[in-house]
Amino acid sequence: MTRLLSLFTTAAVLCGSTGNAAWAQTAELQSTFSQSQLASMAVAFGIPSNLFSADHDVEMYRVTYPMPYLGDTVDVSGALFVPMGFEEPCGLPIHVYMHGTLFKRTDAPSFLGSEGMFGGLMATLGQLVLMPDYVGLGTSQLMHPYVHAQSESDAGYFMMKAADALSGELGYNLNGQNFLSGYSQGGHAAMALARDLTTTGYGDEFALSGAAPGSGPYDISGTQFPMTFDAESYSNPAYLAYNVIGWNSVYGTLYDNLDEVFQEPYASTMLDLLDGTHDAETINDACPPTLEEFVQPNLLDDIFNNPDHPFNLAAQDNDVYQWIPEAPLEMYYCTQDEQVFYENALVAESWMTAEGSTMHEAIDLGALDHGQCAGLAIFGATLWIEDRVEACTDGLPETRHTALSMHPNPASNQVRLAGANPSTPWKVIGVSSGQVVLSGRGETVELERLSPGMWLIQADGLGRGLLSVAR
């Protein structure tokens, strides 16, 4: 039976107003997943059974909560996945998963769209999984501000606040660990939230434990857009219209009329297509095959020749890589990504390294395209987080899996296992297949037989860890 739970609190409106307003979070039960259902779902997604265990039944709620946006307070929605069967004083870690590009409001996680189903698989491992829908998606009827860093971050942070506030009503406790992941647009959103949990007061309430974004456009101004417009065509022209219209709904400076950006007949059709009821395929099919036919002829020259062009200023405002991590940060990418260029991760890695960071890595998952990369990045991030979660046994926290330390990582020819000795047994497992491809004993693993990509290494008594092989 659908259950509606409401909690009313009073809080300061953080954007625009300094007065107080009554804030309300609601949680409506949408579905319950049994362990057997989740195990079958994992098989359907191709997750190796020897690397995944459905440990808990899961309840999924649609949470509606307030957040600041453009000087006002708006209601947004998200999916909350609660693992069942814990007894006090066990506490759960928060895992915020940020979803990728969606055009239809009802494809959002709280409506259990395909990406939303991942939440149950993550939660069954013993994590409280939060999946914000974002402004303009889910139940929100506003225009979605596509890849707008501040609203993405706020959607995540204020859902964390809502989940904390609802804990008593829904019967769970939190253990103080806070993890982030996300793919594609979700990689950008996870990076934005990781930045704000590190560099703003958001982290005073929710200290970041680790983040593992995948294939996100972290450097929009210097990498993603220049590389997009340097080509004759782009794989998903609908994204360009989504971005321009979404950002203009925030800044109001990119255009007065859409025909200043796009040629006809496309300028007259894009607003109707981006009304939250059409999917990506429909919108892409309505776009021309080349950028030359889509974008106004002189616009790109104006943008590239004027650093202060409103489009450049908006892009810079939504770059999300110029900050120093204080918790582990793993940035997954694939080298054949045709949608989000992998150089975004390399630019972020280079900038952070130059600024003295030692907490970050850019992980090459191999020569895969955007779609092929998704499952590996999302599952890899889930394994990485699981190895850092404090599981609760008999009321006492302990790590569910010990995280194996390996150096170097990424590696090309050889990796050293920290704490190993000449007799330590180890094995290398394919993350996609779950099959053991190498085994042996010792302090080092020779990698010549492994193709570039992500591999799981298990060492007896030392735990397991994800290794990136790059050449």
Task: Locate the predicted segments by residue.
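C-terminal catalytic histidine-bearing segment of alpha/beta-hydrolase fold enzymes
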Residues: 307, 312-313, 339, 346-347, ...
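Catalytic-loop region of hydrolases
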Residues: 23-87
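Accessory cap/linker subdomain of secreted extracellular hydrolases
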Residues: 214-322
